[in-house]
């Protein structure tokens, strides 16, 4: 499937009239830093102004950004608000209860190496990426990272003639019709995760670990997909100022960060929106993965639009 896209030179809210419902919205707005961002070249105008009269002015603007973007989500859609922890906390507290109730999680991304010059507080080296869904039923694909030796040693502690294995739940978390039955002398309080024919099949293949307290499904080390990725991301490195990590935009995010968000939260035929396109990382990640059928990225800076257009025509560069 070829991903189609639009690069729109306009204000962030121009998507309101496009009639689309998006499966994924990624918000990476100004962070209320009270700074003006440009590239190192003093002649460059690629960047943005992040100066505000007050925090109240900024929060009023950001609340409008979030609620307007949230309204564009499809029923199974999710929105990621990338900011610092303070601002995302303020934002969550100001959102309507109907939206707050669909808060999914907060991802902490380790965006910086440890600081050696801290004096009066803990080093601030993580960004906050808040995930909120449109409804309780939203699209999500579990992603896996590489297994490290320590995790493998601590998790796959059981062993049989096939090999080392870990224990995964086979009993239910809540009662469901058709899953409440007795098997092998066991009738779990909340039933099973599988129907009886599946439980019988698993047991016939010796894939059930019958423990003293309750049964578990065996997950063998050699069959493991990896370690499920949680909400602390320390394996995606920030873009440095070296030649192999060329920075095209002051607050440019690594493409691997958007790869992960898109792969986990957008179906293959979905639509992605980035109202603050900047360097075009969301666009490039979408084109690289070919997951969404359509992606729209917006920016009000003509040089950012030019940059995104050039990069989208050239493809993914090595410094990403």
Predicted regions and their residues:
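Core catalytic lobe of class I
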Residues: 1-309, 313-318
């Amino acid at each position: 499937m070829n991903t189609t896209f639009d690069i729109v030179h306009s204000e962030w809210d121009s998507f309101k009239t496009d009639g689309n419902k998006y499966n994924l919205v990624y918000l990476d707005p100004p962070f209320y830093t009270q700074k003006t961002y440009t590239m190192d070249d003093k002649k460059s105008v690629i960047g943005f102004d992040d100066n505000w009269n007050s925090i109240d002015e900024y929060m009023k603007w950001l609340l409008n950004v979030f609620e307007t973007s949230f309204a564009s989500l499809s029923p199974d859609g999710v929105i990621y608000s990338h900011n610092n922890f303070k601002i995302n906390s303020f934002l969550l507290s100001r959102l309507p209860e109907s939206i707050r109730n669909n808060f999914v999680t907060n991802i902490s991304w380790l965006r910086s190496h440890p600081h050696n010059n801290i004096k009066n507080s803990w080093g601030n080296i993580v960004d906050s990426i808040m995930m909120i869904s449109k409804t309780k039923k939203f699209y999500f694909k579990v992603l896996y990272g590489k297994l490290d030796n320590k995790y493998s040693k601590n998790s796959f502690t059981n062993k049989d003639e096939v090999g080392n294995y870990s224990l995964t739940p086979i009993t239910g978390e809540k009662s469901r019709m058709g899953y409440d039955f007795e098997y092998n002398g066991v009738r779990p309080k909340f039933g099973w995760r599988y129907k009886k024919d599946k439980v019988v099949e698993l047991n016939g293949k010796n894939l059930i670990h019958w423990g003293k307290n309750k049964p578990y499904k065996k997950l063998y080390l050699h069959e493991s997909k990896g370690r499920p990725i949680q909400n602390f991301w320390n394996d995606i490195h920030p873009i440095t100022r070296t030649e192999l990590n060329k920075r095209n935009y002051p607050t440019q995010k690594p493409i691997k960060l958007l790869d992960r968000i898109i792969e986990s939260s957008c179906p293959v035929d979905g639509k992605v929106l980035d109202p603050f396109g900047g360097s075009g990382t969301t666009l490039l990640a979408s084109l690289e993965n070919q997951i969404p059928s359509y992606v729209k990225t917006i920016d009000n800076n003509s040089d950012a639009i030019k940059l995104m257009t050039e990069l989208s025509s050239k493809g993914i560069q090595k410094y990403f």
